[in-house]
Every structure is written in C-alpha cells, then in structure tokens.
Design a protein with these regions (language model features):
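Amphipathic alpha-helical interface segments used for oligomerization, scaffolding
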Residues: 1-189
C-alpha cells in the first residue's frame, strides 16, 4: 500500500486512481512490485519519446478497463504502447479501440480497406490490406495505433517559412475521408 501511495504521489494520481490501476494490474497477473517497475519503465520510455510521461500514465490508468477487453501483444506493455501512441497523436484510446472494432469483422474490414485503397498514397499503404488490418485489430491494437501514427507522419510536410509541420489542403481532405472509414475523428489529430 505504501508503494502504491508513493507512486500515486509521484505520478500525480489520486490514491483512488492508483488503487484502481493496481487492481487492474493484479487482474492481469501483475503484482505490485512488477507494477511499480512497469510504471517507472513507462515513465522513462515516454520521456524518451518526448511525451508528457504523467499524461501517458493517466491515459493508461483511465483506459485500462476498456483496453482489457482486447488482446494486446505483450499484455500491459502493449497497452502502454497504445497509451503512448494516443498521447502522441492527441487521440483518445477509445477512438483507436473503436477503429479496432470496425476492422474486427471480415466483411467490414474488406469494405473499409477497399474504400481506403481508393484514397491512395500512405492511407492505402497503411490500411489497404484488410486481412492484415483485421489481424492487428484482433491481436495487436497497439500496432494499429502505430500504423495510424506512421501514416499521418508521412503525410505531413515541413513549411520552411514558418518552421512548422503542416497538412496540405489535399491531405486534410484525404485524412477526413480516411477518418470516416476508420471511425476516427481526425479533427483531434
């Protein structure tokens, strides 16, 4: 209990949030000592990625119950990867899980992939294979989130005048159409 309280304080979680997180970890077979190690590892890897590590921990804590109903490669590590991707892309984990739901059934995956292939480019490359996407949705939703992140990164261009990355107008239109097929609100990205 002392370790959980200390962790809660250092991660800016309430005692209740930390206890709920501890329960979720225990339901997955992760004991308190291992939980502490995992949280510290998550904190360090999130910082190394340039992310707000405390926010990643909070997203993990808030989304753990919904993520437990999916198969993640590597268990808690896969869930952590999903939380990191969500923070990186400014998406809710639930949005990414909705995308996984959309590709869960073969018919829906084939139809969505066909529509995404028509958009071409990075979108077709990322989500054009319905069976790969369906496999990821069923077994590795964190990889599905990574694909989404990689796709959007490849679509950005660097504006040398402003020194910022941006989406050209045609790319924004493609993203909007892709978002409709993926079941994701691209305005949040």
């Amino acid at each position: 209990a002392k370790k959980i309280a200390a962790m809660a304080q250092s991660m800016d979680l309430s005692a209740t949030q930390a206890a709920e997180m501890g329960e979720s970890f225990q339901l997955m077979g992760v004991q308190t000592d291992k939980m502490e190690e995992h949280i510290l590892e998550t904190y360090k890897s999130s910082q190394a990625m340039g992310l707000n590590a405390t926010k990643v921990i909070k997203v993990l804590q808030q989304s753990m119950k919904s993520m437990q109903s999916y198969s993640f490669a590597g268990g808690v590590k896969g869930m952590t990867s999903m939380a990191q991707q969500a923070v990186k892309m400014r998406l809710d984990v639930d949005d990414v899980l909705q995308m996984a739901d959309k590709f869960y059934q073969p018919e829906a995956a084939i139809e969505a992939a066909a529509n995404l292939q028509m958009l071409g480019g990075d979108i077709a490359d990322a989500f054009g294979d319905p069976f790969e996407t369906m496999y990821l949705a069923r077994n590795k939703p964190e990889e599905l989130a990574k694909k989404l992140g990689d796709m959007t990164e490849n679509m950005m261009t660097f504006n040398e005048e402003t020194g910022e990355y941006e989406f050209p107008a045609e790319v924004r239109m493609q993203l909007k159409s892709a978002g409709e097929q993926l079941g994701i609100n691209t305005d949040k990205m």
